[in-house]
Amino acid sequence: MMVCQGFTIYVVMTKANAVSGFLPSTNGLHFANRWEPGPTVRLGILDPRLVGVGDAKSGLCGGMSWFVRERFETGQPIPADATAPANGSPLFKAIVRRQIMSLDWMRIPLRFWRAAAMDPGALVRRTVEAEWPRIRAEIDAGRLVMIGLIRHHGTNPMQLDRDHQVLAFGYETESPTGPTTIRVYDPNWPDRDDISLQLSTVGFRQSTGEPLLGVICLR
């Protein structure tokens, strides 16, 4: 804020940053997070879908985000496939392995569950005051960061597949606590460089219209 000849002038200081060299259209997978029904893994003769888990049709957003980050950080080319690989193919198995890694021995689903169970207002405050600064620090350090999008409120663990994982690579913010735009690679929207999350102290939105109640920094 500045005062000049009796007038109060508010100056908005905008800061922007992004991971150098990363764009979803170039470095992201070129197919959408849409998979045919089928088991992601088998436990011996057991099909895990019989107990309500492990169906590819529920999505592999965590594995896709992890795969993209790993390829970028190691300088490996991204596969040119424009359609999701078949169940059991080498690329499918590679993404599934990283999906399992993204769950961090089930610690990540627990974090999603805790966030979804929070009072909505408390989740907004936690996102702005705790999670967003961690995301920003990772990007400022030049690192892609996986983040979780909370899209439902409640305590039913069977609803966790409504939530989502994406990869943040840039931001623009007007102050340490927002309003803020986070640029993301979203596995549901391949080859799009314009997907973003808008955060403020009064609520959140995703540029593609999906509900967004909160954000958590994963790793």
Regions found by a protein language model. Name each.
Residues 158-163, 172-219:
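Cys-His-centered catalytic/binding microenvironment captured across papain-like cysteine peptidases
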